[in-house]
Each structure stands twice: as structure tokens, then as C-alpha cells.
Amino acid sequence: GVVDSAIDAETR
């Protein structure tokens, strides 16, 4: 989802 995508970019 949108939130999941944002978190993924931050935790990369």
C-alpha cells in the first residue's frame, strides 16, 4: 500500500 511503500523507501 501507500504507507508500506513509504516505509520501505525509508528502511532501505
UniProtKB/Swiss-Prot annotation:
Subcellular location: Secreted
Main location: secreted
TM helices/strands, residue ranges: none
Cofactor note (record): Binds 1 heme b (iron(II)-protoporphyrin IX) group per subunit.
GO terms classed as biological process: hydrogen peroxide catabolic process
Enzyme Commission number: 1.11.1.7
GO cellular component terms given for this protein: extracellular region
Family: Belongs to the peroxidase family. Classical plant (class III) peroxidase subfamily.
Name of this chain's protein: Suberization-associated anionic peroxidase 2
Provenance organism: Capsicum annuum (Capsicum pepper)
